[in-house]
Amino acid sequence: MLRLRSGLRHLRATPNTRGSARLLCAEMPKKAGATTKGKSQSKEPERPLPPLGPVAVDPKGCVTIAIHAKPGSKQNAVTDLTAEAVNVAIAAPPSEGEANAELCRYLSKVLELRKSDVVLDKGGKSREKVVKLLASTTPEEILEKLKKEAKKT
């Protein structure tokens, strides 16, 4: 049998069909009130911020925008803001990802962010898309800029 330091795991050897022994691990029982090292215990788990209509914050802290895309339009425009999504007209055909690339370019211009900070998260082949913003910004700022752009049309 193997001898291990106290406090690790207990190992038991059970016979195998081939004649060799197989080791089984069993966790040692925890003491009442014992805490694990390095982990803080909070009473309530951290919750993401409630969504502000189509703009929300994901668990990693990135701002996300729900988009309803309308590819093949004459010009790029934010046409409407609803509780579910931001309606965006895109002046690119919906083929080979052209409309997705144009959507990210247009949103980066409207939101005054770098193109690399606006990433398509979900909906590559759908009109319902989720765009993730990698830049540090607040949902309120994003919603304000989108409303401002929607009023132009």
Swiss-Prot record:
Pfam families, A to Z: DUF167
Highest taxon of the lineage: Eukaryota
InterPro entries, alphabetized: DUF167, YggU-like_sf
Compositionally skewed regions (Basic residues) per UniProt: 1-12
Annotated stretches, region: Disordered: 1-55
Entry keyword Phosphoprotein: yes
Record-listed Phosphoserine modification sites: S116
Assigned GO CC terms: cytoplasm; mitochondrion
Keywords per UniProt: Phosphoprotein
HAMAP family for this protein: UPF0235
Recorded family membership: Belongs to the UPF0235 family.
Protein name as catalogued: UPF0235 protein C15orf40
Native source organism of the sequence: Homo sapiens
Gene designation: C15orf40
